[in-house]
Amino acid sequence: MTPGPTVTVNGRTYRCPRDPVVIVCIDGSEPAYFDAAIAAGRSPAIARFRRSGFATLARSVVPSFTNPNNLSIVTGVSPAVHGIAGNYFYDAAGAREVMMNDPQFLRCETLLAVLAREGAGVVVITAKDKLRRLLGHGLRGVCFSSEKAAEATKEEHGIDRVTDLVAMPVPDVYSAELSEYVLAAGLALFERERPDVMYLSLTDYIQHKHPPGDPVANEFYAMLDHYFDAFDRGGAILGITADHGMNAKSRADGTPNVVYLTPLVESMVGSGQARVILPITDPYVVHHGALGSFATIHLSRADDASRVIARLAATPGVAEVYDGPTGCARFELPADRLGDVIVVSERDVVLGKAPEAHDLSLLREPLRSHGGVSEQTVPFVLNRALVSGTRAGTDLRNFDIFDYALNRVA
């Protein structure tokens, strides 16, 4: 792409890339994972970027889930603008609960689509296919998932024969290799085609199972570091962030530490008079059992909200509770896609519907999950230093990463 021009997307202006830009979103990467891997000598590239590049912490979007944060990263704005408020929501107009994976729910363009329209070569690779259609909306470029790499076609994905790129089989969706496949395919395309912009989004399989410092987690971060080093040495401007963090959410006996909202609320408003929505819900329940730290409640009678809020505010394990408009203003969310009440749990607690609504038999380890303010802090790393005289923002968001990679690095 010819250096020099700029594009303006969703009110933000970006320089078109002069060097290849690679942005990696490490799903579920609590900052302590990098700290532990560096301390164990497993992440020398990240240690190098901390010394000679730029490294700090940033806030992700709350609810701290995959879809809202990935879409914020590629649009540069909050869910109040782009409209993707969770992985799952209640469509009041259609009176149905739906996955928020369809591009019809996206309310603005992505930076990736605009750059491609202006002539940039753009590559998007996701681990899970659930994100692919959202991230690739309006994109003239390459966009595929490692989950369904064998099914990629030029017509739909901008590329075929993806499996020829990587000397490993297409991984199981519940595996660390699903993320490695993203990076391996990304590096192969980077070396072969040197696209102007790449967005590589991983999966949090490891983070749901292994805490920071665990040998398995350190091994995973060593693998990531290998690819970060390769992109850096290949001349890329590399930006690394996460969609959310991750915390332990279990009791001492290993069982999930859950506040079940449906029986609690229905004891006040009556059976069938409240609909609890858990925006963490997605097809990958082995990770979390659809238990996260953010919930929204639709009430048959909106004037019940004040007493429901008062009751929940006094409930152990609940950190914050708001009426819908107040919660949406607090977290920059689209008010028409949240309920009458918004609930956020404490760091070590998750929110559920009712016990019978969650099949926890698939959880093989003590629950680690996300969704709340306690999982909002994420890494924000660039392999290059900021331009001399550039001051870092005092309240960085993970969705500032493209701004920094395109506009602010030396």
Task: Describe each PLM feature range.
Residues 35-38, 211-215, 251-253, 392-394:
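Short, solvent-exposed loop/turn segments at secondary-structure boundaries
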Residues 74-211, 287, 293, 299, ...:
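His/Asp/Glu-rich, glycine-adjacent segments
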Residues 18-34, 49, 73, 115, ...:
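Beta-strand elements within well-structured catalytic alpha/beta cores of enzymes
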Residues 1-54:
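Active-site-proximal N-terminal segment of extracellular/periplasmic enzymes that hydrolyze or transfer
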Residues 345-407:
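Low-complexity, glycine/alanine/valine/leucine- and proline-rich hydrophobic stretches
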Residues 35-76, 123:
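Short, structured active-site-proximal loop/turn typified by the sulfatase FGly-forming signature C/S-X-P-X-R
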Residues 19, 26, 64-65, 89-103, ...:
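Secreted, luminal/periplasmic, and some membrane-associated catalytic domains
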Residues 28-32, 51-57, 65-69, 87-100, ...:
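Glycine-/proline-rich flexible loop or hinge segments
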